């Protein structure tokens, strides 16, 4: 038997309600098993992102609450710190409270990962998705 630790987390009511619907829909035996599965998926994604090497091009998509204290200023300052990596940005208003920013990047994978981590860790950021590709000349034939 695997050793288990018991933890406690706080979640917004609507997030937990939506998670519980998925748990029921997918037929999980318990909320704990669904959370373990979600953590496994997160760990796999993290390992994949951090195994990337070499020259890459891609997008970093960010959804954030623009009412959150200084989030827009912080995201802009971080982007200015990586101006050699960032090719372009696109900003879109999703609704009254949320914006989406798509950052086009090209450069070393380690720098792209570092930028992604800094953007992800900001208060007010709801979701970040990194998509990377091998630049055209490096695509296997």
UniProtKB/Swiss-Prot annotation:
Binds 1 nickel ion per subunit. Belongs to the transcriptional regulatory CopG/NikR family. NCBIfam families: PRK00630.1, PRK01002.1, PRK02967.1, PRK04460.1. Transcriptional regulator. It holds the Pfam family RHH_1. This is Putative nickel-responsive regulator. Keywords: DNA-binding, Metal-binding, Nickel, Transcription, Transcription regulation. It comes from the Archaea. GO terms for molecular function: DNA binding; DNA-binding transcription factor activity; nickel cation binding. GO terms for biological process: response to nickel cation.
């Amino acid at each position: 038997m695997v050793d288990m630790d018991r933890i406690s987390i706080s979640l917004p009511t609507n997030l937990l309600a939506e998670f519980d619907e998925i748990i029921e829909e997918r037929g999980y035996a318990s909320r704990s098993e669904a959370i373990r599965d979600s953590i496994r998926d997160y760990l796999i994604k993290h390992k994949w992102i951090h195994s990337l090497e070499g020259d890459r091009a891609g997008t970093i998509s960010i959804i954030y609450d623009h009412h959150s204290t200084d989030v827009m200023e912080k995201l802009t300052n971080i982007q200015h710190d990586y101006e050699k990596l960032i090719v372009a940005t696109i900003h879109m208003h999703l609704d009254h409270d949320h914006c989406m920013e798509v950052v086009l990047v090209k450069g070393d994978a380690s720098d792209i990962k570092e930028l992604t981590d800094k953007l992800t860790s900001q208060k007010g950021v709801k979701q970040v998705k990194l998509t990377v590709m091998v630049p055209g000349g490096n695509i296997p034939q």
